[in-house]
Amino acid sequence: MLIVRRPPRRGEWRAAVWLGAAICAAAAVVGAGQSSSQQTADFQRQARATCGSCHAYPPPDILPRGSWRDEFVRMMFIREGRLPPIGPPGLANRSVQLPADMEQVLPFYVSQAPERLSAPDSWPDPAAPSPLTFTRRALSVPGMPGTPAVSHVRLIDLDEDGKLDLLGTDMRQGLVFTGTPGSVTTALAEIASIPHPAHITVADVDKDGVQDLLVAEMGEFFPADHAKGAVIWMRGLAKGKFGAFWLDGWPRVASVDAADFNGDGKPDLAVAAFGWRKTGSVAILENRTDNPSRPSFTTHTIDKRAGSIQLVPIDLNRDGRMDFVTLLAQEHETVLAYINKGTGDFSFEQKVIYAAPHPNWGSSGFELVDLDKDGDVDVLLTHGDTFDDGIVKPYHGIQWLENTGGFPFVEHTLAQMPGVHRAQAADIDGDGDLDIVATALLAGGSDVDETTLPALAWLEQTKPGVFARHTIEMGFPRHATLDLGDLDGDGDIDVVVGNFSVGPAVKSWVDVWVNGRK
């Protein structure tokens, strides 16, 4: 799911004079009798002390040379708890004075950073030979503008007629919508108007046999520290109607799911509240409801840090008690497991599944899946967020975190894919193993030719742990979310993606890609 981290559009201005001065400053610090390598090592130690005190040390080569001063300014405002000046960073930050410790290490970063990041890996043309072909169908909400920000799509048989329905959220127009993607109907229908919904889950919270909806409400489209977010329980009523209960006063809520964590028979609500800089947490709302018309929940804060973008309940260690896995973005860039201690008081033991190598990793989402079919649960992780700085990064991609029986999991990079935002595993080609479908979203405004970047792709598992890349859609990646399922009942897996308008209007809200496997 998508979490916009700041209003996109970084400044294109580059201060060539300042860069030259910074590089010269770095060189000039080398004193008499001190080798260049020794001086560089001293600078690096100082950089680790200054830039590694709040998060993992960011090496200079993760950003181009011209971006580092803007990055330092951004970090300064975060560290000081202040809002940055309004406007393109390159212009707005020009007169900002950095603190002494940052001024001292900035020349090191500028001198060691590349002029430009390396070009992203090239991907096959969609017309290249592939084991599968896909046919696109476009779905939209009648009367709505072509500027959707579809943050989540989910396929589920909501009305229990044996066919998959589509549920989705649009965080710009403020809609929860539904559709029948397997039919000839191209119209999506509004279920509810909610200001900025980010995520939707189906669960029977009151255990009355009728499916309910859980909606994560952000409160505002663009990031800010506030308490305008909400957890919304849309209680299922007769004839497909819903009654909404708002549990408000939250930071920006990124996702919510239901599971019984204390063993009392009532589904509790697990909440990933992304927040922004000062706000945000991971929490469980203990379900104390006796009368569904008067919901009652008690909050148990599990992790007080901001940046949780997704949370999935699961009995990870198979002891009969519900645990959960969450992904902390922001400066943390960590996948965490919270193992239920079984004390009935919502106590968990935190375990690190994976910690990214640096704080600019761009974590964007994960799926829990047994990718190697060895009987345990692995993590399929994507990291491709560009909404902090708009820069297309060659190290963004898809990772398999293999569960080998302990923590952390073992990391395998499966493919590099700029802007990758979501990946899911399924047997797309019908050969018995799991393949991967991935979609990408870029903030726009980069200096990379976006016509050459994949927007939707699939990875064919050709042998255990080895994947061949195939492009379904090329150019202008604008998909924050996807889901997989057999929409037409022909026995193979089709793809549904949500569209996220960045700049020009788009022709549809949701695209269905029908698998043409013979």
Describe each model-derived feature in a short phrase.
Residues M1-E12:
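N-terminal secretory signal peptides that target proteins for export/translocation
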Residues S36-K518:
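Beta-propeller-forming repeat regions
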Residues R5, W18, V30-G31, D206, ...:
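N-terminal non-cleavable signal-anchor helices
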Residues A25-Q39:
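Bacterial Sec-dependent signal peptides at the C-terminal "C-region" and cleavage site
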Residues A16-A28:
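Bacterial N-terminal signal peptides
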